[in-house]
C-alpha cells in the first residue's frame, strides 16, 4: 500500500542505489534519437493505424491544438541537452517496483535494456515515467476503469490517476528540486511518453493516450506563456 512515507523512501533508495550517475560524451545525440526520433516514428505508427481519424480539438472541454503543433513548439535542443546521465530503470512506475515490508527492500522488475542503444540513460525519463504513472494509474487501466468518448471534434476522458495523486506529484516535484533537476522537463516528457505509448495499445486506450497527450501539452504550454 503506497503511503507518502513509502514514496519518500522509494525516491531516496532510487537516488542512492538505482540511479548511479555517470558522465558520457555525446549524450545529446542519444537523447535526440530517444526523444525526437522515436516520437516521430511512433506518431507515424499511430497515423498509419488511424489514417482516417481526425484529432480532437477539445479534450474534457479544454481547447487543444494538433500534436504536430505541440511537437513544433518543443525546444528539442533544450530537451536533449538538459540531461542527467545515470543508470536508469527505463519504465520506472509503481507496477514495476516491489516493496517487501519484512526486509524493507525495494525490487525493480521489467527493466528496459537500453536507452537508444545506451546502457545508461537520462534520469529525467525515469522521473517522467513516475509522474506519468501517478497521473494515469496503469492498474486502473488494466482493471478496465478507463473511459473514452469522442463526438465530432471533441474527446472526453475519465480521470484514471492514482488516489491522492496531487500530493504525490508535489512530493516528486520536491525531490526534483532537491536533486537540482528541472521540473519543467519532467512535466514536458509526460505527454511525449503518452504519445509514444499510444500506437502500442488497443482501442480505446490508444486514442485515450493520444488525447491525454494533447491535454497535457496544452496545459504545459498554456502555463509557459
Each model region followed by its residue ranges:
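Conserved kinase catalytic-core helix
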Residues: 1-56, 67-73, 77-82, 88, ...
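Active-site activation/catalytic loop segments of kinase-like enzymes and analogous catalytic loops
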Residues: 106, 114-175, 191-205
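Regulatory N- and C-terminal appendages and interdomain linkers associated
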Residues: 61-65, 103-106, 181-225
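Alpha-helical elements of Rossmann-like donor-binding domains used by nucleotide-donor carbohydrate transfer enzymes
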Residues: 9, 13, 129, 171, ...
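Preference for well-ordered, secondary-structure-rich cores of eukaryotic proteins
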Residues: 5, 34, 38, 66, ...
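A glycine-centered beta->alpha junction motif in the catalytic cores
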Residues: 1-7, 16, 48-53, 113-114, ...
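Active-site acidic catalytic loop and adjacent metal/ATP-binding pocket
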Residues: 69-122
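Phosphate/pyrophosphate-binding loops and the adjoining catalytic core of nucleotide-dependent enzymes
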Residues: 14-30, 41, 45-47, 139-146, ...
Amino acid at each position: 500500500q503506497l503511503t507518502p512515507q513509502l514514496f519518500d523512501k522509494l525516491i531516496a533508495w532510487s537516488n542512492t542505489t538505482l540511479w548511479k550517475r555517470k558522465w558520457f560524451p555525446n549524450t545529446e545525440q542519444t537523447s535526440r534519437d530517444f526523444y525526437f526520433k522515436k516520437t516521430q516514428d511512433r506518431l507515424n505508427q499511430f497515423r498509419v493505424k488511424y489514417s482516417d481519424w481526425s484529432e480532437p480539438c477539445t479534450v474534457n472541454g479544454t481547447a487543444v491544438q494538433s500534436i504536430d503543433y505541440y511537437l513544433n513548439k518543443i525546444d528539442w535542443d533544450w530537451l536533449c541537452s538538459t540531461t542527467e546521465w545515470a543508470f536508469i530503470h527505463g519504465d520506472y512506475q509503481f507496477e514495476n517496483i516491489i516493496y517487501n515490508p519484512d526486509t524493507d527492500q525495494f525490487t525493480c522488475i521489467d527493466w528496459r535494456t537500453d536507452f537508444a542503444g545506451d546502457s545508461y540513460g537520462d534520469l529525467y525519463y525515469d522521473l517522467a515515467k513516475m509522474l506519468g504513472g501517478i497521473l494515469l494509474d496503469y492498474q486502473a487501466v488494466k482493471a478496465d476503469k478507463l473511459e473514452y468518448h469522442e463526438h465530432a471534434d471533441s474527446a472526453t476522458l475519465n480521470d484514471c490517476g492514482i488516489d491522492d495523486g496531487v500530493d504525490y506529484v508535489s512530493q516528486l516535484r520536491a525531490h526534483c528540486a532537491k536533486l537540482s533537476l528541472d521540473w519543467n522537463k519532467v512535466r514536458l516528457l509526460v505527454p511525449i511518453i503518452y504519445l509514444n505509448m499510444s500506437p502500442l495499445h488497443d482501442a480505446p486506450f490508444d486514442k485515450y493516450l493520444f488525447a491525454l497527450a494533447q491535454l497535457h501539452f496544452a496545459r504545459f504550454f498554456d502555463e509557459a506563456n
